[in-house]
Amino acid sequence: MKQHRLRIKGPAGAIETVLDLPAGPPRGVALIAHPHPLHGGSLDNKVVATLAKAALAGGEVAVRANFRGVGATAGEYDAGIGETEDLLTVAQAVQAAFPDLPWRLLGFSFGAFVQHRVAARWPARQLILVGPALGRFDFAPPPIPAAIVHGADDELIPLAQVADYARAHAIPLRVIPGASHFFHGKLM
């Protein structure tokens, strides 16, 4: 794996971005979004790092960016609006280097909300919502094919709420037995 740390010019200033390249020719791009920036979320979050490892194992370029006000990313928290614009900016910059690869959008918690918004404006083939912050943010029906991964013992977002959303929108749901919101002890 080869890793590049970038600063991409965004609407509010520099966006700290990490690009992990697979060992062989890339088969796709996975844009991964972290949890809430006001609650310690960053591109180094353990769930986000696990998603990046899984993407790399599948031959995808793994792209992680810090939201506004986190790490070396400029700006301040913007309730998902500016964060959406920032991820779209990162996607455009990365697409210039990988113009013909298919995209997947992956987001954890607040990052799932932001990726849900990105999916309405970016030509990705799949949206993966991990521990989506349903009830805390507006999640309309996903605009592209989606899947959900959720902890059976999530203390922040009840599994029943996520199961109802998944059922209502015919979204495959994978429940991780014994997993909390942060998947303590359940990551690969």
Regions from the PLM with identified roles:
Residues P142, A146-H150, D154:
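Short beta-strand/loop motif that positions the catalytic acidic residue
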Residues P158-A166, G178, M188:
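Short alpha-helix in the alpha/beta-hydrolase fold that links the catalytic acid
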